[in-house]
């Protein structure tokens, strides 16, 4: 059995694959260069190369401008929301799947149920209240979801890889609350660390969390718009709502639309006015590194 | 007689009701599992990331229960251990993963390769499971929710169906909605911070779906960090999440939720969660672990002792006391 966990510091790794690295991996190691090292950064914190986690967190945080309630899991969505609280959306509140609202954690939480989220929180709800009143009642502006696969309508698979649900080649964790987040949030943001044709697929192996178009095909109208933003290591895909496909609307500096289309398993549409994403600024990186995640629990 | 009855002077103090005898439902873990968990039973084990009744799961393994149907929203390490212990033939769940820390080796072998034997699996979403408990607790025939429209899950789970609302929808049109069936486990087991000897169970922090799961069940076992005096419970009755009449056994089992946590008692053992992917990946290593930590220990006290005080010191938490509220009293 492993050494004791500590609530105040990142844990000693017990396996290289899951260990937070002491030194951040550079974006160039697992993604495109962002030009951040020779960008407008001036602060000392920003001289280090930008990691893919930092890049995705910063880009996601900017998308939260004007939003009030965010349903988020731990990891990049937490970082993005915490950064947004310090920048574009000071009033934004995270609702955690564990039932915590208005958390004021003393340390960066390691899970959605970390004890530090509960101590000092404004409210802790039961599961019927969280899923029934808060989510299904329509109180969430933005839900963050991840998935193993996404298709052009923003339908998500988090259940199985393979042809058969009952004998899959890989059994994934399954729906959890993702179906509820998808059906009931006003809109859904998806963060994908790796933009590949296997994950951005023409046909899902299994549709766990359906977007509104699939629901409407069954004659049932869901509350929300489904996935409206997909933030990846290559750029941003977006759709406004029912009847719209995800389109490429922005790329990171140095990434071409053709690169993104080649990394997408369907015939990806590209917006006429394709934007270039501004690299993380010195101020955003400083806040992320010094205030949001100084222990580099997630910024690996 | 009422307050307006002229025979009772307004100033007379109301007679104190006769004290009701308090049942003592405290049992050892061994006796509680022996009495309330039988081969072939449907057993709900709840606790949403917090207060997971791991020690009860271990005792079920020690006593060699077979052919259980386990009902649990987040089927995590304790379920993987019960699978490795050969106790489970069917799983009803909405999340089959080791938190966000990795995989459940035994569960994946059972589902992906039917090794060492197939596992019957009935899958819902989290709120689908919550609604099954809500329907079960209220003895309703089904419970509606807006989750499944367009999902492939309904095509692999016959329990997920639709009904047409008898009332027109917001647009005046006929409205169809998905429903899930009630679940009424033979027994529900939950873990809590404290209870009195009768089973009035107090939980703070994440309260999850414990009350619904207990009320849905025919029998309920509550495992607690400590059994407290009646007066402690009665000093703060709103803290009672499960009343005594819904509880059949109270088991004192300190640190019985490890590797999950008990708010205010000990922290989550995150390192253990991360190590489970490695332990459970190799069936031989997993069986060695089960032999050493579950089958090789007489009870949970031995498991706790084997972890060692140094380990527990690393999971210790400091105080963060709530301010008392004033319930008031009649003068």
Question: Model-flagged regions — what are they?
Answer:
Chain A
Residues 272-300:
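A conserved C-terminal secondary-structure "cap"
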Residues 43-121:
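N-terminal active-site beta-alpha-beta segment that forms phosphate/nucleotide-binding
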Residues 22, 38, 80-82, 161:
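Residue-level recognition of conserved structural "scaffold" positions that shape functional pockets
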Residues 64, 68, 84, 88, ...:
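Structural signal for hydrophobic packing residues in well-ordered secondary-structure cores
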Residues 1-5, 108-276, 280:
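Conserved phosphate- and dinucleotide-binding cores of soluble alpha/beta proteins
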Residues 2-47:
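Intrinsically disordered, low-complexity terminal tails and inter-domain linkers enriched
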């Amino acid at each position: 059995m492993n050494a004791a966990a500590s609530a105040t510091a990142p844990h000693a790794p017990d396996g290289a694959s899951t260990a937070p690295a002491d030194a951040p991996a550079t974006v160039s190691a697992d993604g495109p260069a962002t030009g951040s090292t020779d960008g407008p950064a001036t602060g000392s914190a920003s001289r280090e190369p930008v990691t893919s986690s930092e890049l995705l967190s910063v880009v996601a945080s900017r998308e939260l401008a004007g939003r009030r309630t965010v349903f988020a899991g731990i990891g990049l969505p937490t970082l993005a929301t915490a950064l947004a609280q310090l920048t574009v959306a000071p009033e934004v509140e995270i609702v955690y799947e564990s039932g915590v609202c208005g958390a004021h954690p003393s340390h960066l939480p390691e899970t959605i149920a970390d004890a530090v989220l509960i101590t000092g929180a404004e409210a802790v709800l039961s599961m019927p209240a969280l899923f029934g009143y808060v989510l299904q009642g329509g109180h969430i502006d933005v839900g963050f979801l991840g998935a193993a696969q996404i298709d052009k309508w923003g339908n998500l698979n988090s259940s199985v890889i393979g042809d058969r649900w009952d004998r899959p080649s890989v059994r994934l964790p399954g729906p959890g609350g993702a179906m509820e987040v998808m059906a009931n949030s006003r809109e859904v943001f998806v963060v994908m660390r790796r933009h590949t044709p296997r994950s951005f697929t023409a046909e899902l192996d299994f549709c766990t969390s359906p977007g509104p178009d699939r629901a409407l095909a069954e004659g049932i109208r869901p509350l929300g718009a489904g996935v409206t933003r997909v933030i990846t290591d290559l750029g941003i895909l977006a759709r406004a709502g029912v009847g719209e496909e995800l389109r490429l609307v922005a790329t990171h500096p140095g990434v071409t639309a053709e690169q993104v289309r080649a990394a997408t398993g369907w015939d990806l549409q590209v917006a006429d006015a394709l934007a270039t994403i501004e690299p993380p600024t010195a101020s955003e990186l400083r806040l992320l590194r010094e205030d949001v995640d100084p222990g580099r629990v997630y910024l690996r | 007689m009422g307050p307006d009855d002229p025979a009772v002077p307004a100033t007379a103090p109301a007679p104190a009701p006769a004290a009701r005898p308090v049942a003592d439902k405290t049992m050892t873990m061994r006796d509680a599992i022996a009495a309330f968990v039988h081969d072939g039973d449907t057993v709900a084990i709840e606790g949403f990331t917090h207060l997971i009744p791991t020690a009860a799961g271990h005792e079920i393994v020690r006593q060699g229960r077979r052919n259980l149907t386990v009902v649990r929203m987040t089927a995590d390490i304790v379920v993987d251990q019960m699978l490795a212990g050969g106790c489970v033939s069917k799983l009803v769940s909405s999340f089959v993963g080791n938190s966000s820390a990795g995989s459940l080796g035994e569960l994946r072998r059972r589902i992906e390769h039917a090794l060492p034997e197939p596992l019957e699996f009935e899958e819902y979403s989290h709120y689908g499971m919550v609604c099954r408990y809500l329907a079960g607790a209220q003895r309703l025939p089904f419970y509606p929710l807006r989750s499944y429209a367009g999902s492939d899950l309904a095509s692999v789970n016959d329990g997920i169906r639709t009904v047409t609302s008898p009332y027109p929808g917001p647009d005046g049109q006929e409205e169809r909605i998905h429903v899930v069936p009630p679940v009424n486990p033979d027994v529900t087991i939950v873990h809590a911070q404290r209870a009195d000897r009768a089973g009035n169970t107090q939980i703070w922090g994440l309260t999850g779906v414990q009350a619904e799961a207990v009320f849905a069940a025919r029998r309920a076992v509550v495992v607690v960090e400590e059994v407290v005096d009646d007066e402690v419970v009665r000093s703060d009755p709103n803290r009672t999440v499960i009343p005594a009449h819904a509880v059949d056994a109270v088991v004192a089992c300190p640190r019985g939720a490890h590797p999950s946590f008990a708010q205010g008692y000990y922290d989550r053992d995150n390192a253990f969660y991360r190590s489970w992917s490695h332990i459970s990946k190799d069936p031989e290593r997993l069986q060695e672990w089960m032999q050493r930590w579950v089958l090789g220990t007489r009870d949970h006290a031995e498991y706790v002792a084997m972890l060692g005080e140094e380990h527990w010191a690393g999971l210790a938490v400091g105080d963060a006391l709530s301010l008392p509220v004033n319930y008031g009293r009649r003068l």
